[in-house]
Swiss-Prot record:
Belongs to the acyl carrier protein (ACP) family. Its main location: cytoplasm. This is Acyl carrier protein. It holds the Pfam family PP-binding. It comes from Baumannia cicadellinicola subsp. Homalodisca coagulata. 4'-phosphopantetheine is transferred from CoA to a specific serine of apo-ACP by AcpS. This modification is essential for activity because fatty acids are bound in thioester linkage to the sulfhydryl of the prosthetic group. PANTHER family: ACYL CARRIER PROTEIN, CARRIER DOMAIN-CONTAINING PROTEIN. Signal peptide: none annotated.
Length: 77
C-alpha cells in the first residue's frame, strides 16, 4: 500500500493536472501548481473522499501547500 504522502501527491497531481515531479512538499497549490479557488475546493473534496475524513472549512483554508495537506491527513489518522 502507498504511504499517505504518496497518495496525497497522486491526488494533487491528478486534481491539478500537473506532473507528479512538480508536486514537491514545498509547492504551493496556487503559486507553484497554478490552482485557482475552485481547484483547491475540489482538491480538498478529493482528499476527504480518498482518506474517508472530513476537513472543516477553517482547516481547509490552511491547506495551501503539499506538505500542509500531508500533515493534515497524517494528523487526522
Amino acid at each position: 500500500m502507498s504511504t499517505i504522502e504518496e497518495r496525497v501527491k497522486i491526488i494533487i497531481s491528478e486534481q491539478l493536472g500537473v506532473k507528479k515531479e512538480e508536486v514537491v512538499n514545498t509547492a504551493s497549490f496556487v503559486d507553484d501548481l497554478g490552482a485557482d479557488s475552485l481547484d483547491t475546493v475540489e482538491l480538498v473534496m478529493a482528499l476527504e473522499e480518498e482518506f474517508n475524513t472530513e476537513i472543516p472549512d477553517e482547516e481547509a483554508e490552511k491547506i495551501t501547500t503539499v506538505q500542509a495537506a500531508i500533515d493534515f491527513i497524517q494528523s487526522s489518522r
